[in-house]
Amino acid sequence: MRKLVYYIGVSLDGYIAGPNAEVDFYPTSDEMANWINARYPETIPTHIRKLIGLDGEENQAFDTLLIGRGTFEPALDIPTTSPYSHLRQYLISSTLEVDDPNVTVVKEDPIGMVQRLKREESDKDIWLCGGGKLAGTLLSEIDELIIKSYPVIAGTGIAMVSGGFDPTGFVPTNRVSFDNGAQVSWFSRT
């Protein structure tokens, strides 16, 4: 069965973005960027893949993307209505309309939809791209966390998981460190 994997960048104090969806405060490095491009090229937006020579690269881990409205909306400013056209894209939103054949807008119960997607035959998993509200809604279905932890305190912003109090156990399975002080850590549900 496929897994729902929450692959996300986060500050030391648990924020995936600033209060206005800023992510430019994360320290970058060529070492980490090269690692991400090789290991998870499908997590790079389509318009950037073309600029850095990843256009046409095979998806390594994911073939399906779930994205909430708050994470999706910045793509409209680029402008694009299909930020990850190399993946099957599901936009979870009860209010946003997108007229793009590559994006399926889901207004229904996202938990039921995730359960159906998990039962599909595929050697690739499902990427929960964000945001924190959607992660909170889907917490019961998240099988694995891949957290890019950056050595910075944001102070406030968009929480990695938003929702009610729901302690959920995960066990660490791997960790990689980079020259910018960031780490990628893998956690599986206990």
Language model features by range: what are they?
Residues M1-T190:
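Enzymes that bind and transform nitrogen-containing heteroaromatic metabolites
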